[in-house]
Amino acid sequence: MFLIQNTLVSLDVLEKDFCCDLDKCRGCCCIEGDAGAPLTDEEEEKIREILPVLLPDMTKEARAVVEAQGLSYLDPSGEKVTSIVNDKDCVFARTDHNGWCYCLIEKAYNAGKIDFKKPISCHLYPIRLNQVGDMIGVEYHRWDICHCARVLGKKLHLPIYQFLKEPLIRRFGQEWYDELCLVADEWKKQGK
């Protein structure tokens, strides 16, 4: 682990390669798993504000889940996560005619309809954040369904922290990211 400002960054974030390969996985991280995506109170409030833009594109099942239980629920560990359909699909996920999964929030953002890209936990994936005392742990979450992303990342020699530059800056700021890059460069120079 490396200490960068108020974070403890896992060595895997610097050493492991990763690059989403949507041609292979088709975005299955949005529709697999046993819980929704981690969500902050602020993000839930923002999604509540933009929900009228999203509702028309949500599936009938997703709208029913949101109506019945709301935008989020507490997972077994007590963490607030996005609501899911049929115990796996995020309520904001849709599948196109080619079987590709996409995020309705991100689609609306890219179309200029809203000013919120998506929850930071989704944007940062495969990094997960967790509280470690008064620090934030920044850790790599290894999931079997992302095997193709590890293969492509290795082929491209693209470490996780470089692949996730934009969301890391979004969450922690440019100064933090620059410091992370310095730590990574020093680590490489030492032949680690």
Task: Enumerate the predicted regions with their spans.
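Short loop/turn segments that flank or connect secondary-structure elements
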Residues: 1-192
